[in-house]
Design a protein with these regions (language model features):
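A conserved beta-strand element that flanks and buttresses the S-adenosyl-L-methionine
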Residues: 2
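A short His-aromatic
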Residues: 5-9
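S-adenosyl-L-methionine-dependent methyltransferase catalytic module, highlighting the catalytic core
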Residues: 11-113
Length: 113
């Protein structure tokens, strides 16, 4: 399953992650990309922020409901996945990264065991 920048829009992301785990066959792979602020130890949510401009400032986009922290892989593991972060861009040259317009982000890969 490829879940590319979806979970930050979902109100109950824990339920969504559990559902992804449920529908994935044993040994299947989930790639779940989300915006991660590496300066945050834990994921941040604040439902009291309703102004679109303030949401953009805090969460990076007006329609996001959270900004993930370094605990994202733990959130996946709590739902039964075995996950790790892969830095694919580190395997490429700077020329390739620019050519393909890649970001140097960690790609969360989770396996259903």
């Amino acid at each position: 399953i490829l879940c590319n920048h979806v979970l930050e829009h979902v109100k109950d992301h824990i339920q969504a992650i559990s559902e992804l785990h449920r529908v994935l066959k044993k040994g299947g792979t989930l790639i779940a990309q989300v915006p991660i602020d590496e300066k945050l130890e834990t994921t941040f949510e604040d439902n009291s922020i309703i102004d679109p401009n303030e949401r953009s400032r805090v969460f990076g986009q007006y329609d996001h409901v959270r900004i993930y922290g370094n605990d994202f892989l733990s959130l996946l593991n709590q739902s039964g996945f075995k996950s790790k972060g892969i830095q694919y861009a580190n395997k490429l040259s700077e020329v390739e990264i620019k050519k393909y317009c890649l970001q140097k982000e960690v790609i969360p890969v989770a396996i259903k065991s």
